[in-house]
Regions:
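Bacterial N-terminal signal peptides
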Residues: 11-21
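Residue-level signature of outer-membrane beta-barrel architecture
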Residues: 86-92, 133-135, 149, 167-171, ...
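Residues that define the transmembrane beta-barrel architecture of outer-membrane proteins
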Residues: 48-50, 76-84, 123-129, 157-163, ...
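Transmembrane beta-strand segments that form the barrel wall of outer-membrane beta-barrel proteins
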Residues: 56-62, 100-110, 114-116, 131, ...
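Short loop/turn motifs that connect adjacent beta-strands in outer-membrane beta-barrel proteins
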Residues: 40-51, 89-101, 121-123, 136-142, ...
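Outer-membrane beta-barrel translocator domains and adjoining extracellular loop/strand segments
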Residues: 64-72, 112-122, 156-162, 192-197, ...
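Short glycine/proline- and aromatic-enriched beta-strand/turn motifs that initiate or cap beta-hairpins
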Residues: 24-114
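Predominantly the C-terminal beta-signal and adjacent terminal strand-loop region
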Residues: 217, 241-296
Length: 296
């Protein structure tokens, strides 16, 4: 099952995962990696081996893996993210289905700069790039090894590197209907530590035909181990759940999806306190994202 949602990068689930609904021009599905947490999703594309992917989203805040990333949840700065990426089919099975892929994208965040953001370009506060090698040994099973570099063009944060292993099960059975996914990440440059994420994303069609809207109910549990969130932070955990409404459209010859998503982050005491003083220390944080994703 190809998922029809894209997660908001700061919400640690549905961002990262990009997905676009099927359309008359869609000929195959390729895997895709989220820049924030390295989770896998599927995205419908056209024929051929090279597939550009573009997305734009607007959010009420920027949170990464349950913790404040740059912007608190509110309408103070309203960050905008532009992601450019793609997938290349390297190998096909005897039936023509893609089995080995190179995938990647660069997600770039922009907002109204704060007084402390003095390095030009002041508004460009993050640039997260991930590249991976994905393998589909059988239909409905996708694995990937990926490497991400997360930088701050305006110098507000230090550059970090991460290595990840990721898995997605999307076969046409009862378990595949839940679209379970898991990723394990080790930070190779920065604070260090290990991060694990486990999520599901059951999806429901709200009509008949390929142009029908869909409703997805994502749910995730993420754990940062060994001071992943901050030096001395220990092991921290959060959960995320909500809903994503997506409608397939045609834009410039691309298979596209317009999406609206609402998530609730639920953090443990140690994780929520890490947000002070720049963000809320509430246990529950509401996040909303509107996005457009296009794939060729």
């Amino acid at each position: 099952m190809t998922q029809r949602f894209r997660r908001a990068a700061g919400a640690s689930l549905v961002a990262a995962s990009i997905a676009v609904s099927a359309s008359a021009a869609s000929a195959q599905s390729v895997p895709f990696l989220d820049t924030e947490d390295a989770t896998l999703s599927g995205i419908d594309v056209g024929e051929g081996d090279v597939h550009p992917i573009l997305s734009v989203d607007v959010r009420n805040g920027d949170y990464a893996r349950g913790a404040l990333d740059d912007d608190a949840a509110g309408l103070g700065r309203v960050p905008v993210h532009v992601a450019i990426g793609g997938a290349v089919v390297l190998r096909r099975d005897a039936d023509g289905r893609g089995s080995v892929f190179v995938v990647g994208q660069s997600s770039n965040g922009f907002h109204a700069p704060g007084a402390e953001e003095r390095v030009r370009p002041r508004a460009w506060y993050e640039s997260n790039t991930i590249v991976g090698l994905a393998w589909r040994p059988v239909e409905g099973v996708t694995t990937a090894a990926a490497y991400a570099i997360k930088a701050s063009p305006n110098g507000i944060a230090a550059t970090t590197h991460e290595a990840s292993l990721s898995f997605l099960y999307s076969a046409k059975d009862a378990i595949g209907a839940l679209a379970p996914r898991v990723a394990v990440t080790r930070r190779t440059k920065g604070n260090g530590g290990v991060y694990t994420i486990l999520g599901i994303a059951p999806q429901f069609a709200l009509g008949d035909g390929e142009s029908a809207a869909t409703l997805t109910l994502p749910a995730t549990v993420g754990v940062g181990w060994q001071g992943f969130y901050a030096a001395g932070a220990g092991d921290r955990v959060y959960g995320s759940t909500g809903l994503t409404l997506a409608k397939p459209v045609r834009i410039g010859g691309a298979s596209a999806s317009v999406q609206a998503e609402v998530l609730a982050l639920v953090r443990d005491d140690g994780l929520r306190r890490l947000d002070a003083p720049g963000g809320t220390t509430d246990t529950i944080v509401p996040l909303a994202t509107v996005s457009v994703t296009m794939a060729w």
